[in-house]
Regions:
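Flexible, glycine-/basic-rich loop-and-beta segments that form/coincide
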Residues: 1-49
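C-terminal target-recognition/interaction regions appended to catalytic cores
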Residues: 48-184
Length: 184
């Protein structure tokens, strides 16, 4: 939730560009990136790197379908918490994204397969650092890496996952500028 307020009058948000029938899909945002194995880094983009999966998680993601979750797996791959008879058991983890739907909310641990619905729609891995950034609407050439230090996926994930999506920030900024301009 974003709250905008001004003691000078009501701030009106600019009209939405997207709605439930017209939106940016996962494919729109990341579909043009080169394929990547888990644990690999694209030699042309150090941010297009994916976390290495354990052998068990490799088996799990192979059985996951786009839009699916751990419920798609054979019983021998399920964790004890997923076998509860209550019907509960962390339904929003170990998911795989769908190409033609919007991305789920990107969190600080989106690069881990078991941390949400962050399985790549097609490739057997979690999202890369670059893919998370693109889904947050950062430009493709944006660098989170400090050339003087080796940044970890965790530190970059915190930057990306905690960020206000760039295009949302732009819409908020434009709304505030319009408000100030309209005041004269």
């Amino acid at each position: 939730m974003v709250l905008l307020a001004s003691r000078l009058g009501n701030i009106e948000l600019i009209p939405p560009i997207y709605d439930e029938n017209n939106y940016i899909t996962v494919r729109d945002a990341i579909g043009n990136l080169p394929a990547l194995e888990d644990g690999a880094t694209d030699p042309n983009d150090q941010l297009h790197r994916a976390s290495r999966l354990s052998e068990m998680n490799r088996k799990r993601i192979r059985q996951s379908v786009p839009g699916g979750s751990w419920k798609d797996w054979d019983d021998d791959l399920k964790l004890p918490c997923h076998k509860k008879t209550s019907g509960k058991g962390y339904r929003a983890v170990y998911g795989r994204m769908e190409w033609d739907k919007p991305s789920p909310t990107i969190t600080t641990q989106y690069y881990g397969y078991g941390n949400g619905r962050f399985g790549h729609p097609e490739q057997n891995r979690a999202l890369s650092m670059r893919e998370g950034a693109l889904l947050q609407s950062f430009p493709n050439d944006y660098q989170f890496l400090d050339p003087e230090h080796q940044e970890t996926n965790r530190s970059i994930g915190v930057h990306i996952g905690n960020a206000v999506p760039v295009e949302l920030g732009r819409a908020i900024g434009t709304s505030i500028l319009n408000h100030l301009h309209n005041l004269g």
